[in-house]
Curated annotation (Swiss-Prot):
Compartments, as annotated in UniProt: Cell inner membrane
Protein known as: Potassium-transporting ATPase potassium-binding subunit
Lineage: Bacteria, Pseudomonadati, Pseudomonadota, Gammaproteobacteria, Enterobacterales
Superkingdom to which the source organism belongs: Bacteria
Source species of the chain: Serratia proteamaculans (strain 568)
Oligomer status and interactors: The system is composed of three essential subunits: KdpA, KdpB and KdpC.
Keyword Cell membrane: yes
UniProt xrefs under NCBIfam families: kdpA (TIGR00680)
Length: 562
């Protein structure tokens, strides 16, 4: 089993790096503003038709463009979900959603969270899935990448007042990156058996003579961008555990690769644009170290399973509850880490059925800000926030003004960094406290005790950090949870984006100083260790008390009771 685990992790990382390196070089061209020569005229025609100026923006103009663009998308998606009952491409005749569920779902997909308080095959029409959710899968992903582009430019520009043009960035990211790669992935999924049709649901008779309904729909096209854009919202309720979404071990492997592909490629892009590839390599090393350790811990926990099973006569303690036999323990454990290290949230098993320790690791990966590769764009700018915090701490220790890539890090930068890092923990802890201290919050908990608290903590961690996965034992389709989680998702998304863009505006205006004898190298093993330690320390100080009340207590109850 250990050899199989090693081969799975090693092969995944090898293929990921081989694919991410050339994509990173291509993304670097987009960051530096180089359009594809073949599409230069197409771009010019689009801007003429839209009446859009190609002039660059300062940070607050960029932020306003991103914010208004997403608010418009939220309003349109909300209207579509409310009125789907009277719109076409609804062969099952599903009615419109309730206002609170429609609002929660609209916020969820606009913020790249894809939290789902519903089951897609029994709630949404094909039009809502395609024109609503799938469109936002592209646009929310493009938003995150665009913000990362702006921050990368800020580190590399000298005495500049602008960080790029939001409209051009979103357009190029969608047209040149997300659409073509999604098309290739969708075709591969179709070849493996993923559904792609517009048929009404099929009613069949099983071998036992019972009647069964098989859901249909344009699944593969949505599945591709769901993974590539680290969105995570499934066409079906059980997400990638459904054989119509994720039919084979090969599609499972490709889905994991798709989740990490752009976040890893952006690290290469960062190093290339900065003029020092080793800067990007250092980020990849730091992310990979945390990722591999997390995978090993979850695999160990799920293989150790439940010690009480052997007492009941079971031949094995391995925890297969809630898992698909076609994937097995190792691939399922790795998928759970990939999807929560990134802000994806897609699942190929029920995380609520993991062991206490196995479920705690995905929860913790979300709580540290999903900076282990992370979401498309958000993973990189989230990790760069920790980089700024690390160089600030290192500067305090050696008595020098902190700097990164030749840019001095001043008080304003650190205030914005602290604000961005503290937004999501505040939402998680205060939201969890509100849920468990009110009757309407406690009413949704189906499993009392430590695990019930873990379900609430997981839900708020997932929403605030824009992940979207869940512990299924919590009833969240209520006005209380729909509104609470929608607030956490929106503030968790834009409450981080705005400080990041403010940092970008501050950094791009500064001169880039040459490195001196006392400059801290930000690419070697020492800095990688400091960066990993900072991420772990912030996560530990913030969430250990809450984790002790939930998964840690549950783990001790399981292993110390007879």
């Amino acid at each position: 089993m250990a050899a199989s685990a090693f081969l799975l992790i090693a092969s995944f990382m090898l293929v990921l790096l081989l694919l991410a390196r050339p994509l990173g070089s291509f993304l670097a061209r987009l960051i530096e503003g180089e359009p594809l020569p073949a599409l230069r005229r197409v771009e010019a025609a689009v801007w003429r038709c839209c009446g859009n100026t190609t002039a660059e923006m300062n940070w607050w103009q960029y932020a306003l463009a991103i914010l208004w663009f997403n608010l418009l998308g939220l309003a349109l998606l909300f209207a579509l979900l409310m009125t789907q009952g009277s719109l076409p491409l609804n062969p099952q005749g599903f009615p419109g959603l309730s206002w609170d569920l429609a609002f929660n779902t609209a916020v969820s997909f606009v913020t790249n969270t894809n939290w789902q308080a519903y089951s897609g095959e029994s709630t949404l029409s094909y039009l809502s899935q395609m024109a609503g959710l799938a469109v936002q899968n592209f646009l929310s992903a493009a938003t995150g990448i665009a913000v990362a582009f702006a921050l990368i430019r800020a580190f590399t520009r000298r005495s500049s007042a602008t960080i790029g043009n939001a409209w051009i960035d979103v357009f190029r990211i969608t047209l040149y990156v997300l659409l073509p790669i999604s098309l290739l992935i969708a075709l591969f999924f179709v070849s493996q058996g993923t559904l792609q049709n517009f048929l009404p649901y099929l009613h069949i008779s099983t071998l036992e003579g019972a009647q069964q309904t098989l859901p249909m729909g344009p699944v593969a096209s949505q599945e591709a961008i769901k993974m590539l854009g680290t969105n995570g919202g499934g066409f079906f309720g059980v997400n990638s555990a459904h054989p119509f979404e994720n039919p084979t071990v090969l599609t499972n492997f490709v889905q994991m690769l798709a989740i990490f592909l752009i976040p890893c490629a952006l690290c290469f892009s960062f190093g290339q644009v900065a003029g020092e590839n080793r800067q990007g390599h250092a980020l990849i090393w730091a992310m990979s170290l945390i990722f591999v350790v997390a995978v090993v811990v979850v695999m160990y926990a799920e293989l150790a399973g439940n010690p009480h099973l052997s007492e009941l006569g079971s031949a094995s303690n391995i925890n297969m509850e809630g898992k698909e036999s076609r994937f097995g323990i190792l691939a399922t454990s790795m998928f759970s880490v990939v999807t929560t290290a990134a802000s994806c949230g897609a699942v190929n098993a029920m995380h609520d059925s993991f062991t206490a320790l196995g479920g705690m690791v995905p929860m913790w990966l979300m709580q540290i800000g999903e900076v282990v590769f992370g979401g498309v764009g958000s993973g990189l700018y989230g990790m760069l926030l920790f980089v700024l915090l690390t160089v600030f701490i290192a500067g305090l220790m050696i008595g020098r003004t902190p700097e990164y890539l030749g840019k001095k890090i001043d008080v304003y930068d650190m205030k914005m960094t602290a604000l961005a890092i503290l937004v999501t923990p505040t939402l998680v802890l205060l939201g969890s406290a509100l849920a468990i201290s009110t009757d309407v919050g406690r009413a949704g908990i189906l499993n009392p005790g430590a695990h019930g608290f873990s379900e609430v903590l997981y839900a708020l961690s997932s929403a605030a950090n824009n992940n979207g996965s869940a512990f299924g034992g919590l009833s969240v389709n209520t006005p209380f949870y729909n509104l609470l989680l929608a607030f956490a998702m929106f503030v968790g998304r834009f409450g981080v984006i705005l400080p990041v863009l403010a940092i970008a505006g501050s950094l791009c205006a500064k001169k880039r100083q040459p490195a001196g004898n006392g400059t801290l190298p930000t690419y070697g093993p020492l800095f990688i260790g400091l960066l990993v330690g900072t991420v772990l320390l912030v996560g530990a100080l913030t969430f250990v008390p809450a984790l002790a009340l939930g998964p840690v207590a549950e783990h001790l109850q399981l292993w110390l009771t007879k």
